[in-house]
Structures are given as structure tokens and as C-alpha cells.
Amino acid sequence: MIKDLYKTWNIQSHNIHGEEFTGYEPVYDQLDQLDKPAFNKDPEATVNKVFDIYRSINIVPILYFTEKGLINAIKEFKSTSYNAVKNSKISLGNNRGQPLSRFLFPNMMTAEPKGRGSNSLKDRFYNDTKLKRAIRICYEMREGHKLVYPTALRRALELVTGENIQNFKPQNARALVEHLCPVLWGNVYDYSAGYGGRLLGISCSN
């Protein structure tokens, strides 16, 4: 399975830097130098430099896993506490597991909003104009350090055009299924369980 995922994400052996990786670890020092003062001094040149760095590696900026890293991350996810359903409501939070879902379900990164062809998050990353727009968003809407690291860039790509496929939070799926079926080893039918975070959350429930 892991080889198929790597093929889908275009991950090569030289992109792997630890059990959890973005593939951009070797260029973090370069990205650190392209900070907010650098952008304020010369916005266009800074955006172009960041763009060139990302194109030099050219993989979608999400968190990836080795097989061992994936197993460890799923175990950690399963042992993490979460907000259960109370009075037919789930409290805010329950964000754990989202990086796992992005990696395990590439369809979440390639799904397109209805009527907007070539507008998936993956398409936006490989579109030069949209990638540069996302880089600019990183500088214009955030302060601090690591402004153009992969996580920040992914979030900015989600803002480009403003239309995104939303994943179901795995921990919310886990909370719902255990609320609906509190019996250990019970069965719940979910017609969309295979699409994204619902499958991860349900498979880690009781």
C-alpha cells in the first residue's frame, strides 16, 4: 500500500527524511531566510525565490509517512482523547488525524468543486500562477516565522479561489460512531466511510 501511495504522491526515495516528512526538509534553511522583512523589501523577488524552491522538489506540501511512521501515527491517533457527543452535540476541536487523512486519501487533494475543473488543491499547487498567489498570501496574511513552510503553504493554497473539498474530521467520525453504537464491536453502516477521515475515525473506534 505504501508504495502505491508514494507513486500517487510522486514521492521518491530522496524525498524521505524521517518517519514523518514533507520532502522539503533540506530547503527549510533557505525558506527561513525568505522571511517577512525580505518580502517587504522586494515582494516579487521573494515570491519568485520561494516558488523556485518549491518547484525544485515539486511535491504537494502535506505531511507524508513511511510505513513505520504511518503505523505509529495511527496508534497515537487511536490513543488520543477526543470530544465525545454530549446532548447531541460535539464540542469544537477533534482535529487530530487530519494529516493522516490527507496522506491516506489522495482523492481529498484531487477532488474538484462542482463546475470548476482543474481546481483541486493538487491542481492549484502545480499551477504556477496559483502557487505564486498562495506564496504571496502566506506573507500578506501571517506574521512570525516559518511563513512559507509546507503547512502554511497548503493552508494558503486552500484560500486560492476559496473553494475546497472539506474532509470529515476523523475524531468526529469516531465520536459519532461510538455514540450511535456504544456496544463493543458493534456495526455501523456508513455509505461514505471510504472517502476520507470517516474511515480512519471509524476504524480506530470500538
Where do the PLM segments sit?
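Conserved alpha-helix/loop element of class I SAM-dependent methyltransferases that forms part
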Residues: 163-184
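N-terminal accessory regions of S-adenosyl-L-methionine
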Residues: 1-166
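Conserved SAM-binding loop of SAM-dependent methyltransferases across substrates and taxa
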Residues: 175, 195-205
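Conserved class I S-adenosyl-L-methionine
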Residues: 183-194
